[in-house]
Amino acid sequence: MEILKSMIDPKIVMAIVISFIVASILGPIIIPLLHKLKFGQNIRQEGPKSHLKKAGTPTIGGLIFIFATIITMFIMVGNPTDEAMIALYSFVGFGFVGFLDDLLKIIKKKNEGLTSGQKMILLLIVSGFLTWYAYKYIGTSINIPFLNGQINFGLFYIPFVMFYFAGVTNAVNLTDGLDGLATSVTVLVTTFLGIISYNLGHISLAIFCVALAGALLAFLRFNAFPARVFMGDTGSLALGGAVAMVALILKMPLILVLIGIIYVIETLSVILQVASFKLTGKRIFKMAPIHHHFEQLGWSETKIVSVFSIITVVFCFIAFASL
């Protein structure tokens, strides 16, 4: 009943509708502009050969749902709470790092943007401020799923949160490897976080979450196979920053292991692949991240996205049961 109540609240419904409409309007404006500016995606040669035909598809499309979410937030919440503003900062801050990375890839005309050092410094600046905020205003305790208890990290909270932001943003970035995959999964993740935020009384935060979900639903029309636009690192890092910060505000960073199970699997597949090859000279998967493994097995992009989305739904229900 609480879930149903949150989804029929007029503010929640309006936020979803407005962000969907705004993103639907922005898409046909931004996509042709990206074409005109020749902001096309460079495809990795070592990736699946079927992806080579995607070269030139406009990237940096994450701007569509970033702008739509921001516009909706300020329409629906004239004076957002501090927690909603810090979630927006995380969303835009990480997205800006991704934007710089995408821009350099386009300028260089190859799939290499910021150097690892440059990217690390920028991400540390963004996550460093967020970690300071979390330590000072959110507190150092986090909830443990299924156990109905908390653990206080004390000073260890600082390195934990820094590692957490790096892990979540990179995990979402790895998931963005198929048309519509990161978009579909994150629609479900942000919807879950919106429901929990609402039920815990964080109304501004809930509006941010569902506004993002509505914008992503509209973006999916342009990003689903065959994609007319890619979100780029602009979008994937922004999404990682958003879900990471919202879960942290709710003191539920560990819940992302459940609702973000696809992010976790994608990341683990890369770690295991690299470790196995370095230790034994053999690969566990045909290709990593794991969505490419299923492509090599003959699965269509649409099938992979559908299956991964269903898995996310199942784990969202498991996450509800854990609270």
Swiss-Prot record:
Record function comment: Catalyzes the initial step of the lipid cycle reactions in the biosynthesis of the cell wall peptidoglycan: transfers peptidoglycan precursor phospho-MurNAc-pentapeptide from UDP-MurNAc-pentapeptide onto the lipid carrier undecaprenyl phosphate, yielding undecaprenyl-pyrophosphoryl-MurNAc-pentapeptide, known as lipid I.
Keyword Cell division: yes
CDD domains per UniProt: GT_MraY
Domain of life of the native organism: Bacteria
One example of a Gene Ontology biological process annotation: cell wall organization
EC number per UniProt: 2.7.8.13
Broad class of the protein's primary localization: membrane
Protein name: Phospho-N-acetylmuramoyl-pentapeptide-transferase
GO MF term set: metal ion binding; phospho-N-acetylmuramoyl-pentapeptide-transferase activity; UDP-N-acetylmuramoyl-L-alanyl-D-glutamyl-meso-2,6-diaminopimelyl-D-alanyl-D-alanine:undecaprenyl-phosphate transferase activity
Species per Swiss-Prot/TrEMBL record: Clostridium perfringens (strain ATCC 13124 / DSM 756 / JCM 1290 / NCIMB 6125 / NCTC 8237 / Type A)
Gene label: mraY
Gene Ontology cellular component list: plasma membrane
Pathway this chain belongs to: Cell wall biogenesis; peptidoglycan biosynthesis
Segments crossing the lipid bilayer: 12-32, 58-78, 84-104, 120-140, 151-171, 177-197, 200-220, 229-250, 303-323
Pfam families: Glycos_transf_4
